[in-house]
Curated annotation (Swiss-Prot):
The keyword Kinase applies. Phosphorylation of dTMP to form dTDP in both de novo and salvage pathways of dTTP synthesis. One of its GO terms (cellular component) is cytosol. HAMAP family: Thymidylate_kinase (MF_00165). PANTHER family: THYMIDYLATE KINASE (PTHR10344), UMP-CMP KINASE 2, MITOCHONDRIAL (PTHR10344:SF4). It catalyses: dTMP + ATP = dTDP + ADP. Disulfide bonds: none annotated. Belongs to the thymidylate kinase family. This is Thymidylate kinase. One of its GO terms (biological process) is dTTP biosynthetic process. The keyword ATP-binding applies. Its EC number is 2.7.4.9. InterPro entries: P-loop_NTPase (IPR027417), Thymidylate_kin-like_dom (IPR039430), Thymidylate_kin_CS (IPR018095), Thymidylate_kinase (IPR018094).
Length: 211
């Protein structure tokens, strides 16, 4: 069922949302119109509420790293069970902006949370229901910070340090070399070149998928 589940991953400011829309356009050009998009954290009413709690600083209370992780997995569970699985069960394609991998990179490598806890949460919530294909948009952390600083409002995570984003990026890159379903792309290139690479890859990938 997850053959139709594709995700775009990467640091904040790497261009994930743009690429998700470009992939949807690619599918439409291939006459595949039963496509939905998702964004983590969010995508359902409850997941959106959790997303707001995660992203916005409280005036009177500090959100702990553990609470952040638990809320992310709660939001992910809501999205997976209420949106992603039902869509895939119907035969739709799902193009996601982030997935379980983000927590391993951001909360695991970035926040330095316990890997045993992360694996346990992933097993219970995801239960090996992973995307068939992940495009990881690789971009230097310095470029990320220069891009996101131009945004009007930065959320809690976007305000993190260069060393934090370096740890997150290192984890993404390491995993991309180890996992066959993670395709690493140099996202510091012009958008047109990134899209050409993705379209060519999808051409071959879809051909192999439907052999």
């Amino acid at each position: 069922m997850n053959n139709r589940f594709i995700v775009v991953e990467g640091l904040d400011g790497s261009g994930k949302t743009t690429i998700v829309h470009k992939i949807v356009k690619y599918f439409y050009n291939q006459k595949i119109t039963n496509v939905i998009t998702t964004h983590e954290p969010g995508g359902t009413e409850i997941a959106y509420i959790l997303s707001e709690l995660i992203k916005n600083k409280s005036k009177n209370e500090k959100l702990t790293d553990l609470s952040e992780l638990l809320m992310l997995y709660a939001a992910r569970s809501q999205l997976l069970e209420n949106v992603i699985k039902p869509a895939l069960f119907k035969g739709d394609w799902v193009i996601g902006d982030r997935c379980d991998l983000s927590s391993f990179a951001y909360q695991g490598a970035g926040r330095k949370l316990n890997s045993v806890l992360l694996n346990m949460l992933s097993q219970y919530v995801i239960n090996d229901f992973f995307p068939k294909l992940i495009f990881y948009l690789d971009i230097p952390s310095e470029l990320v910070l220069s891009r996101i600083k131009n945004r009007k409002v930065l959320d809690r995570i976007e305000q993190e340090s260069l060393s934090f984003f370096n740890r997150v990026r290192s984890y993404y890159r390491k995993l991309a070399f180890l996992k066959e379903n993670i395709i690493m792309i140099d996202a510091s290139q012009p958008l047109e070149q990134v899209c050409v690479f993705i379209y060519r890859y999808l051409d071959q990938w879809l051909c192999d998928l439907y052999k």
